[in-house]
């Protein structure tokens, strides 16, 4: 474990020492871990327009896997489903545009949910997002509606009652913004979100019905250079006091104070660590120094987070205001290569398992053949990578790469940005399924030891 706030004069000496120590101590362990193969099963939810999904999953208390399939289509919104492992049955639950009360509006639809569900009192709380984009100069922006259609109305805070099978529509984001990040403080009845593209921080109070916009936190958000800043995708909450934590590409840790209804910058530490590499937060091609995915770990009253591209696991103690760099969760082939991963938009697939202390992580890493990193291209020209299942036992500080994931025909799941771990330890994700007319659907990876 590397302490995050080492004084600057001795920092490089510490880094060199730790790297050397890591090579000595971890090298044999990595060599001992054979890169095995796991065989995954794909499902057919019956939605031919399905597109890439980010988060949008949960293994709920009723044993079912809930998920959203997105659609980049002007006439069709994202669709919500459940999979019952006991019955081996998929059920279509609803259309996100209809759930938002916008059926027949003839506007840009609620094309996706970009957030993980939060379960509370038999309901799944989540938010909707836009899936209607244009790309210019490598910059993604909301596309204008075609003739005869209205602009995107804005993302919604929603809930789904698992027993009644009904949706509730609470509030809509301002200025036609999507909701790209969300979490819920179930104890205090608060939903929080960050909007796209401007990066407004929203809070919605379930009891009063009040939606408050605390303003932009990311300069011009993901709107344009040179003031562009990538918006945080994960908002872990400290249940003890109701504080919400988030980061920016510059490496600052921000804290929403429930007691003051205000946002402040944590002064004791930050994520600008040598271990994470050197990043230009302006480019938008990566996620800078901010965490990509993060969750609250109650046994230690701490946040566990993954940094994008490097896949380093971080631990943040909110009261001590201390960041520790723990372990690189990248696959064994990626770690051996010493390189970052090719795919820029992953690193969201982090979740606690059913035992409450094991982290599960899906990472798209290097393809290695004959001991060397191989470059393979997909039909669209993108570099292919192997999807690996990684686990990290927190109390034991034990990293395990369980191997690359393939379908029975040898094809690779791709574009994985989601994860849910069932009660039996099976790992579910939403992935590109090569050879299918639909692009993305549910995938199951069998339990591992």
Can you say where each PLM-predicted feature lies in the sequence?
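Surface-exposed loop and turn segments in beta-propeller and other repeat-based domains
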Residues: 41-46, 93-109, 168-177, 215-227, ...
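Beta-strand-rich domains and repeat architectures in extracellular enzymes and scaffolds
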Residues: 44-78
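Repeated scaffold domains used in trafficking and secretory/extracellular systems
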Residues: 51-56, 101-116, 177-183, 222-236, ...
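Residue-level detector of Asp-centered blade-edge/turn motifs that repeat once per structural unit
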Residues: 60-62, 119-121, 186-188, 238-241, ...
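Short, conserved, GDST-rich strand-edge loop motifs in beta-rich repeat architectures
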Residues: 70-74, 126-152, 362-386, 433-440
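Beta-propeller blade signature
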Residues: 80-86, 144-162, 313, 378-395, ...
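Loop/turn-rich, solvent-exposed surfaces of beta-rich toroidal or solenoidal domains
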Residues: 306, 311, 339-394
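Blade-level signature of beta-propeller repeat domains, shared across WD40, Kelch, NHL, RCC1
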Residues: 413-449
